[in-house]
Swiss-Prot record:
Keywords: Acyltransferase, Amino-acid biosynthesis, Cytoplasm, Methionine biosynthesis, Transferase. GO terms for molecular function: homoserine O-acetyltransferase activity; homoserine O-succinyltransferase activity. GO terms for cellular component: cytoplasm. Transfers a succinyl group from succinyl-CoA to L-homoserine, forming succinyl-L-homoserine. InterPro entries: AB_hydrolase_1 (IPR000073), AB_hydrolase_fold (IPR029058), HAT_MetX-like (IPR008220). It comes from Herminiimonas arsenicoxydans. Pathway: Amino-acid biosynthesis; L-methionine biosynthesis via de novo pathway; O-succinyl-L-homoserine from L-homoserine: step 1/1. It is found in: Cytoplasm. This is Homoserine O-succinyltransferase. Substrate binds at residues 221, 350. The record marks 318 as: Important for acyl-CoA specificity. The keyword Acyltransferase applies. Homodimer.
Amino acid sequence: MTSLGIVTPQSMFFSTPLPLQSGAEITDYTLVYETYGTLNADHSNAVLVCHALNASHHVAGSYSEDASTRGWWDNMVGPGKPLDTDKFFVIGVNNLGSCFGSTGPMHANPATGKPYGPQFPVVTVEDWVQSQARLADALGIRQFAAVMGGSLGGMQALAWSILFPERLRHCVVIASTPKLTAQNIAFDDVARQAILTDPDYHGGDYYAHGVVPKNGLRVARMLGHITYLSDDDMAVKFGRDLRSGSYQFGFGIDFEIESYLRYQGDKFSEYFDANTYLLITKALDYFDPAKDFGGDLTKTLSHTRAQFLLVSFSTDWRFAPERSHEMVQALVNNKRMVTYAEIDASHGHDAFLLDDARYMSVVRAYYERVYKEIDGGSLKAGAQV
């Protein structure tokens, strides 16, 4: 397996207003994206990869020789990798409201010429999917071979199967959920409160004050990071190890886990936008496609037409395997073709980003099947399942 090498982001401007679930709309917006591989003649080999909370369009490859610039899913996407760019044309899109290039709170509001800040409209998973569909239209892709994502990205993939059932043949949902539990919403709210109560937040207009609510971002990230790890993984990595070998009898850093979380918080506060964090966690909280169907997930998924791959991880307590079981059962109730794997992995929610041989083998085998449909000539442009 080799790397994609140096990749370059692209952008596309849209002047047609995008209506949002809230009733608001976004006008004059830009989506930043990257593509890997080659689109075949009938456009049947395109795969959309949707990103999670703090990720972006930069799925794979690098921006320089510096390894730190590698994409967030470089182990998954590339030549000879599970999602093989020698076979598929892969697209990564940065979602609206993000801080990595697509229009978001940091960008100028056309109506005022000043940063949107807290005036940027609340967006939902469904809004992101609508914007991604517009990008697909502009790229000449009527139907994806697959739409794929992990965590929040998996929610977007699921939403694609509901909103545009005819526009994807396969839906790959990894370490995800059909809705957040009360516990998950509680974690998100505490994280938001850390930001909202930071004196440097200034009601979201901190750009004008030349400051960043770093303390709030630090705490939000520290809290979030705890939910991405498993108790088993934390015990192995950190246990009760002391940073200096003995108690300091103060309120500084005693334990290695404290040092690790503060490092993660400090790093996050240097590159992520606070208003974006608020927006994305709200999108997480609001995602509940079964809400309009009386909470019945089977009814919600009754109009889907894709085939599905779902993967969960045994120690993921952020989006536990039970959440994937719910989706699998609803799909089976609808007699949909579904492949499911629960990986016994110790790394918690973050396992979906890591190199577990069993996990990678499952995804690789599934995409080999997807490719056989294309390469075997059974599909024509616009073919539907």
